[in-house]
Amino acid sequence: MTMMDMNFKYCHKIMKKHSKSFSYAFDLLPEDQRKAVWAIYAVCRKIDDSIDVYGDIQFLNQIKEDIQSIEKYPYEHHHFQSDRRIMMALQHVAQHKNIAFQSFYNLIDTVYKDQHFTMFETDAELFGYCYGVAGTVGEVLTPILSDHETHQTYDVARRLGESLQLINILRDVGEDFDNERVYFSKQRLKQYEVDIAEVYQNGVNNHYIDLWEYYAAIAEKDFQDVMDQIKVFSIEAQPIIELAARIYIEILDEVRQANYTLHERVFVDKRKKAKLFHEINSKYHRI
């Protein structure tokens, strides 16, 4: 195993640890594509964790400077400051793919702002956040998952990322509240007459369910729009993207089956993932 292979293996471990659903799906890509996904996921995870886990703004600055070095001089030797193994893997990817570096910087800017979280006044602000933390990831992955990236390809990948982030929010309402965060907008909370603190303390009510389903309908519509345009991605990537997205959309039904609880994180079990895999395998005949 070469040193570069070890770098990619390190990135893969990060992805498997933090997102079993993504790993389950994207590990089915051809080798070069899945390695690129591992590297990009690992970079994005380190960006996310720089503040939430490490509480280290300097580490986030180092990540940004390392990415800038790769963008400017992709073939030069660099003394990376953040995580050398991840950055070497990203540099290798950047030498072969047209990486949308600005999307990395947009993600970093969102993480900077998230240090001083305040509730969103409107849904527009919420959806802007979903772009910043997840739509950006879709943009960065676009050259890996398509043969000829176009404006439409970037748009579809961006919308998929935003949809998956909204699903994350719908899954983690209680966990986020424990961390003193409510991502639903004040505008929509007022419209549906919902106080998350009250729901957390006293249990789910019809007002909360209606609010939750309002946002779930948006995520489901975006998911369907992506599925309707999935042919913008490469033949190899189409079944993988559909598998990842369908595993994620299944989370919404898991929340429903758990009676919208705020006190337990739901997940899609291995049996259901395997069922989805076989359905999509039959559809595409080539996973």
UniProtKB/Swiss-Prot annotation:
EC annotation from Swiss-Prot or TrEMBL: 2.5.1.96
InterPro entries: Isoprenoid_synthase_dom_sf, Squ/phyt_synthse, Squalene/phytoene_synthase_CS, Trans_IPPS_bact-type, Trans_IPPS_HH
Keywords, alphabetical: Carotenoid biosynthesis, Magnesium, Metal-binding, Transferase, Virulence
Cofactor: Mg(2+)
Pfam families: SQS_PSY (PF00494)
Residues engaged in binding (2E,6E)-farnesyl diphosphate 2: 45, 165
Reaction catalysed by this enzyme: 2 (2E,6E)-farnesyl diphosphate = 15-cis-4,4'-diapophytoene + 2 diphosphate
Note on how the cofactor is bound: Binds 2 Mg(2+) ions per subunit.
A GO BP annotation: carotenoid biosynthetic process
UniProt pathway: Carotenoid biosynthesis; staphyloxanthin biosynthesis; staphyloxanthin from farnesyl diphosphate: step 1/5
Positions that bind Mg(2+) 1: 48, 52
SUPFAM superfamilies in the record: Terpenoid synthases
Gene Ontology terms, MF aspect: geranylgeranyl diphosphate synthase activity; metal ion binding; squalene synthase [NAD(P)H] activity
CDD domains from the UniProt entry: Trans_IPPS_HH
Annotated (2E,6E)-farnesyl diphosphate 1 binding sites: 18-21, 41, 45, 171, 248
Enzyme class: transferase
PROSITE patterns: SQUALEN_PHYTOEN_SYN_1
Binding site for Mg(2+) 2: 168, 172
Function (record text): Involved in the biosynthesis of the yellow-orange carotenoid staphyloxanthin, which plays a role in the virulence via its protective function against oxidative stress. Catalyzes the head-to-head condensation of two molecules of farnesyl diphosphate (FPP) into the colorless C(30) carotenoid 4,4'-diapophytoene (dehydrosqualene).
PANTHER family recorded: BIFUNCTIONAL LYCOPENE CYCLASE/PHYTOENE SYNTHASE
Family classification: Belongs to the phytoene/squalene synthase family. CrtM subfamily.
Protein name: 4,4'-diapophytoene synthase
Species classification: Bacteria, Bacillati, Bacillota, Bacilli, Bacillales
